[in-house]
UniProtKB/Swiss-Prot annotation:
The active site is at 147. It is an enzyme of class 3 (hydrolase). PANTHER family: PROTEASE HTPX (PTHR43221), PROTEASE HTPX HOMOLOG (PTHR43221:SF2). This is Protease HtpX homolog 2. InterPro entries: HtpX_protease, Pept_M48_protease_HtpX, Peptidase_M48. GO terms for molecular function: metalloendopeptidase activity; zinc ion binding. The chain crosses the membrane at residues 17-37, 42-62, 158-178, 195-215. It comes from Sulfurisphaera tokodaii (strain DSM 16993 / JCM 10545 / NBRC 100140 / 7). Its cofactor is Zn(2+).
Length: 325
């Protein structure tokens, strides 16, 4: 287990560094070539300041938008109906040696759980009503352990920082595209408006490529949150496996057969998702799907466009961790 956790942590750190270094190197090279390498740092600083301001505003006030979209209602320990949910979050927070975040119930018609934070709104966790009805309390604790992991690991801040790179590439590319479209200007290399136009398009394309790198980092972040649940919550690995299976089965009760007929076809790679849900799921189907995920070989590219790992990859990682509990 120690090696699995260490390998995942090192991979996340190296991936984040690689995205930042390669991104800034590409931006510096392009701007330096067209506007002079002495001017490139100033241009990068200006563009970075512009993008960072909007990113910080999103970070600071994003929780207010989340609360509105998900119709969140805060829960406290004395709540006669959902006080037990607060107690579960408090218990898992204690396992993780952190203060209990604010707990919310989300009145939306699909199973989901998520954590979010900002300096203004603090640490928060929300669980939707269908998820609470679908899972056992032990499975809910495992899900909470996953979400607490996101808070512990400062995942919001990590993604905002790394996400600056594709955003910078896009807006600089967009600016060069317009510069080329309007005829360049400024003398020297900048007279070649056609090159500016093409480089702008190339940078926009690179921004989408770097978004794939960010998705790769995000999948590791999700796996690391799974690990957090497995190592901090009693029986967290086993319970998170069955929770994931229940949530997937709730979107399509016959999904096992669909897996067998056409590999990899699943409506969503999100851990907690679905809209047409079935909350009454037979235990044998849960175990059958978990067993299926444990034994299939997943293509490295099965989740390349997803921000979550393929469910089978998650189950197989959690299965390794069950032997340590």
């Amino acid at each position: 287990m120690i090696w699995e956790v260490t390998k995942l942590r090192i991979s996340m750190i190296l991936s984040a560094i690689a995205i930042l270094v390669l991104g800034f190197a590409l931006i510096y090279g392009i701007l330096g070539y067209f506007f002079g390498f002495s001017n490139a740092p100033l241009l990068i600083t200006g563009a970075l300041a512009f993008v960072t301001i909007f990113t910080i505003l999103q970070w600071l006030f994003g929780p207010a938008l989340i609360k509105s979209i998900y119709h969140l209602t805060e829960v406290d320990p004395t709540d006669p109906q959902y006080g037990w949910v607060y107690n579960l979050v408090q218990e898992v927070a204690m396992y993780n040696r952190m203060n209990t975040p604010k707990v919310y119930i989300a009145n939306v018609p699909f199973p989901n759980a998520f954590a979010f934070e900002s300096p203004i709104y603090g640490k928060n966790m929300a669980i939707t009503l269908p998820l609470l009805r679908m899972l056992t309390p032990e499975e809910v604790k495992a899900v909470i352990g996953h979400e607490i992991g996101h808070l512990r690991h400062k995942d919001t801040e990590l993604l905002l920082a790394v996400g600056l790179i594709p955003t910078l590439l896009y807006w600089i590319g967009y600016g060069l595209w317009w510069g080329g479209l309007l005829g360049g200007g400024g003398g020297g290399r900048n007279d070649n408006s056609g090159i500016l136009f093409l480089i702008g398009i190339a940078l926009i394309a690179f921004s989408f490529l770097f978004n794939l790198f960010v998705l790769f980092l995000n999948r590791m972040r999700e796996a690391y949150a799974d690990v957090n649940s497995a190592i901090t919550v009693p029986n967290g690995a086993k319970n998170l496996q069955t929770a994931l299976a229940k949530i997937v089965l709730s979107t399509d009760p016959d999904i096992i057969e669909r897996y067998k007929k056409k590999y990899g076809q699943i409506g969503s790679m999100l851990l907690f998702s679905g809209f047409q849900i079935n909350e009454d799921i037979p235990a044998y189907k849960v175990q059958e799907l978990v067993e299926y995920w444990r034994n299939i070989k997943v293509s490295p590219f099965a989740d390349i466009f997803s921000d979550h790992p393929h469910p089978a990859k998650r189950i197989q990682l959690l299965e390794k961790l069950t032997h340590t509990q």
